Swiss-Prot record:
Biological process, per Gene Ontology: endosomal transport; protein transport
Gene3D superfamilies referenced in this protein's UniProt entry, alphabetically: Leucine-rich Repeat Variant
Protein name (database record): AP-5 complex subunit beta-1
GO cellular component: AP-type membrane coat adaptor complex
Subunit structure: Probably part of the adaptor protein complex 5 (AP-5).
Xref: InterPro entries: AP5B1, AP5B1_barrel, AP5B1_C, AP5B1_middle, AP5B1_N, ARM-like
UniProt source species: Xenopus tropicalis
Amino acid sequence: MAERNSASWNRKVASFCSEPKTFLCDSSVDGFLGELLKDLQSEAIHGQTKILMMDLLLEFPEFLCPDQKTVEMTAETLMNILKKMPSSERSMTLRCHLLLAIETVLITCESFNQNSKMAQDFASLLMHIISDVNDKKQGVANRPLRTTACECLRELESCYPGFLSQRMEKLYLMQQQEVTAAHQSYTLLYTVVLKNAIRFLAQKEGPSNGALKNALLSNEDFFWSATENMVELQPSSNEQLLLLPSNSETKDLKSILALLLEDSYLLTPVCQNTLFWQIVQVVAMARTISPVIFKSQLVRLFSTMDLSCFHSILQMKAVFTDSLFTGEDEHFLIQRLVGMTQHPLLSTPVKLFYLDCLLHFPENRPLTSNSEENLPVLLTVQMTSSLFPNVFNDHSTMLCRQNVLSMVYLENEGSYSEKGIAFLFEHVMSLYSMVHKNGNREITATFFRAVHLFVQYFNFCEKHMENLTEKLLKLYMSNSSLAPNFINLINQTQILLEFHVWPVTLSKALQKEIVNLPTDKWTMKNLGWHLKILSRVAQENSISQSSTALFLRRVVFCSDLCSKGDWRTGNALLSVCKHVLQHQKLSAIFVHLADLLQYLMHRFEDIDVQDRARLYYVLLTNVSSDKLGKILTMSPARGQTKSRSLSSIMTENENFSTMLTIRNAEKTLLCLQPVLEGIKAFTCISDSPSLYCIVLQFENTDCRFESISDINVPCLFVDRKPPVVTINLVPKEPYPTIFSVSATYSTQDGITYQTKLDPLYITFREMFIPLPLPALWPLESRFDLFGKLWSAFKPDEQNQFEESIFCYEMSNNSLHDIVLDNFSKFAVSCNGGEYKIAVFLPPQFHILMHIKSQDDTACFSVRTDNWNLLPYLNSHLLDITLQ
């Protein structure tokens, strides 16, 4: 196959990244991977394009390397490419990506072990690359490759802890000798190796007995077996691994750590954070080393403006607490956090991070051991006086500040706290004013979240809660479309305040406002929102539903609601009725509810609403209230196949409308498979349930074919042979195409699902059919027809006819096999190594081929009445000749 150019590979990579599985359905994994590896060695492909091609190995190694044999072959090919590349600055980026690709393939596909020759060669290659300290051998141009090799080794050490623990002396010497910009990578590599080595020794518990010294001075082969039984050290874990080195070992280790800390200022802030965290874990395990070793660094870190460095302080404090930080240090850090949360030069996400640090501050002596939000004991009301939220803050800052201040005022008493609570209530009211004046969606959501926070912390303040309830009622009456927000507020506060009456008080107040509304146009316009509120209120057994039943009766009797027959409104009415039917005090409203249901079942102009009203009426008049509540709240037993009883249909989460709802299937249970030439079938996954009323739907992705009608299959059972379905294709143009396929089906529990199937690919070869000739035509007549068509298809400027020649090196026997396998049905004559092939492509086009072999070269002479077919034919001939 001819090599693809760079533009073609760019399109190929984009197509693969968008849908890897779909892409590989059209071409074999081995073929595509082989083509990719081959073109990586081609000089015709640009370097940037090769990097894009290797991105496929970095992002999708599990797709391209499904087995160990493929992994080894891929890694070996990439290694050979790397070794053949010149050590030039121009090829440096590509060489770095080759290292990353090899490592990714080996690690991701679980092939990096001592049984893999490529793994051993790759690890040795990385060590060889980083041994060129200070660019003495390869020069400055090779420095990016050394840096990448260091990062690769660090990744290997992170994935396989202890892998480099027997090379520590060499790594330490290289780290000390390196004085170029690559020093940072060498330092991080050595620090990770040191931490893992000490953690490995600490697992044995007790004194090290010289093992630590031996590890620090080791310079042997890779430690392949060190990847087992390793645990992660948490910042505040009470089950840390401990190592007790001897005095001489402690001195050596302390000297190494001190040198690493002295070099920390040479690193970038992010790398400093990584370095500090590794050393923190080392000191936490080696108990003979005091955390005071970090004191000299704290002086510099306390004044930092960098987020990563400040995070290092918090990590140290979480691990070492008062063994490193005094009370004054803790007070200073809290003041610093408060100041940083409002620093004008910091971005909003950074300030929110500092606010979150306040809520999870690692105290020296915390009052509680839980990991939830808790304020530091040293954080006072006066310290947070500048954190009051205002409407000019962004919404996240506004809510976070309100949360912090609410906790401060809740834990403190006195006049400051009372004033603070009043200020917070004023802030909530300022948000209310913005929402009341038609605030946008974001302001509305912020207001309700602010209300939730205020109720969470200050529900005991009766005066503020009464004022809040009044404002909420006023807001709802002015904007009833906020009903979902009110329902969510009631639900969440009821969960939060299980035994508090405020959610019920708000519900009762909303009910009172709604039922007193007149049945005018404004009320009818917002009736849907009112019914949602009443449906939620009806779920409270402590609230009488007499006024609700009378309001519904008045709305139905005094309006044209029934004559309009709106299905959605009717079901909203019946949803309220369903919850009223479950109310404990049903006898008080029996007559009103019965009149309402009877009126709906006779007058409402929608058959579904009538049937549902009739069901409720029958239940109301024939079943006791105790049984009625159980029936309407009944759910099917777990594992029960037939779950669609009338009672389950009418529950809140499985109401009548869900029977008409088509759900998206969580996983695909069906797939199309070709079972015979020209025929497609679909099969069922072995552990799938029985499916019924299956409808296959096909959607054109272009205009090349007529639409395919839906195909209906009555049922599909796991233990039976899958049915065969025939798909009738009517092409408008004889070009390859793709049909999007979906299936709608029902399961045994009565639920209807829709799922997308793999696309149906129609290839160019599948459109070939023999010339539509009578079956009894003699061969001579067919031969004469071919000759006349060949002459008729001679191209000129007046038609779309075209001729072309395709040549490929092959023997006579190979050519005969290709014709026999691919064109036997279309052959007009086969005489003396010459073949004449005639192909008809619906709706009205033809391809004629005169094939012969000369000097071990097959020559395909082609004529067609549609020149647009030639590129597709050329690709097809390339495919069959390569096979």
